[in-house]
């Protein structure tokens, strides 16, 4: 952040100690997508990439080999640079092999080439340390903002997942953690449950998180304006 500090080492008009006071609308928005394996996270990411053609989206995945982007989104002359793949519509996808913070820092030079970031987590990931990553480094903090934490749930299996006994190290299980941390919940595969079961699912979700916006869909086809600003 040396560009934000005066020559005499004093803080500039950007803020105390030279830390820039960057408005949120000038930071790259990040949507974190959580949810158990099979809930539809990757399908949602692919759907957004296909439907939001006017936006340049960077996708960060934990396991690119296991949860791949649809091949029809990748151009024939695909550009590859280590774990970064550039798609035909200008979007990019990269894999986190280790440190998410390092990946975000590496993206700083590229961030002005895309409009937003979709960060897809593994199925058992606790979202709280992922969100905290955006506060651990000053460069990351002034260049990115967590816009939304979106939790995908499988209508058929979420109640069973919520009923699982947590490990000794956790007060609640992974499904409850993901729901509790979300500001948007998408109930997927609603065609696989009865109306009564769906009502029960919604009640269970609200018992964990009464403040999240809850949407429902059959095959991840959602109104993008409601979950993707």
What are these regions (language model features)?
Residues 3-34, 39, 43-173:
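Nucleotide-state-sensitive switch-loop elements of NTP-binding domains
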Residues 2-6, 174-229:
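C-terminal accessory "lid"/substrate-recognition subdomains
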């Amino acid at each position: 952040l040396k560009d934000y500090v005066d020559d005499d080492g004093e803080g500039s008009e950007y803020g105390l100690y030279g830390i820039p006071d960057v408005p949120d609308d000038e930071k790259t928005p990040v949507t974190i997508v959580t949810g158990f394996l099979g809930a539809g996270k990757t399908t949602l990411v692919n759907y957004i990439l296909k439907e939001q053609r006017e936006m340049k989206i960077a996708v960060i995945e934990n396991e690119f080999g296991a949860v791949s982007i649809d091949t029809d989104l990748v151009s024939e002359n695909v550009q590859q640079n280590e774990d970064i793949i550039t798609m035909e519509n200008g979007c990019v996808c990269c894999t986190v092999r280790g440190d998410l913070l390092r990946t975000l820092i590496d993206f700083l030079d590229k961030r002005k080439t895309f409009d937003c970031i979709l960060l897809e987590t593994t199925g058992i990931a606790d979202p709280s340390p992922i969100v905290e990553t955006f506060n651990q480094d000053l460069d990351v903090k002034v260049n990115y903002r967590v816009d939304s934490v979106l939790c995908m749930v499988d209508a058929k299996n979420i109640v069973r997942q919520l009923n699982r006994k947590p490990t000794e190290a956790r007060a609640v299980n992974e499904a409850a953690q993901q729901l509790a941390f979300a500001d948007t919940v998408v109930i997927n595969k609603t065609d696989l449950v009865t109306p009564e079961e769906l009502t029960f699912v919604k009640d269970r979700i609200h018992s964990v998180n009464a403040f999240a916006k809850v949407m429902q869909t059959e095959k991840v086809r959602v109104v993008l304006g409601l979950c993707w600003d």
